[in-house]
């Protein structure tokens, strides 16, 4: 009997994403706590409630990335409406400064009393664990605003303005209110059943029915890929193909880049058929790996095997900075 399983039917079937697979490879125990929290409800209701809270915690560094995406999206949506002036740019940055300060003050109160309603709450892991964080706020705000300044001063800003004026269609993500329905990938065409795949780029351009551009903004550590492009860009391209052309790039041009806001360096190229074939193979392989940690390997029921089957990382450094470090020790 699986003492960590819940009798309640999970809300979702098994899902795949690059983020989810990266977490599985990082630490299987953390993967369990992040995606199978419901399995703690029967035997560990208090720990389940605490785990739900911890899932909403983010470090201030992670919040910088999140807020950078918010601010750039705000700017691009205003630019798309031809509403951008120097005054408007300062207004957007001032709004973000106020938003980040208000969020920080809210987090600093450490009010975690409503343990069944964490959705949309802003909490910093530094505050939860009693770490000094006051000195981190202003540098974080300046980095977020600086990311926007660097984008505006870069050639990409001029290119984006040209796209708004000449392209057939331009998509700008709304990261504050993500549309999960529109993120769904039609995986039936790549032989997956009872598995959901979500993907949504930050910025997309349709030049014609056969010519596309995909951009993904990055605010973290710059990763230089030699002779390839990121898996995430490949997934975005696959999603686009699956909407109309199955999985063949024949006659279709999809150009994709990751743009690092800190340096404005970009990495990518025009997608090749081998990129599409490779990501299809990877998704199917990853799903098989995920299914090994499900009862009866059933992705529709999506019930995890016993917690102890989810191996903890052997890296002390990973554990030291893990959001779930206290919970993990209590479950051992």
Where are these regions (language model features)?
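RecB-family 4Fe-4S metal-dependent nuclease core
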Residues: 1-332
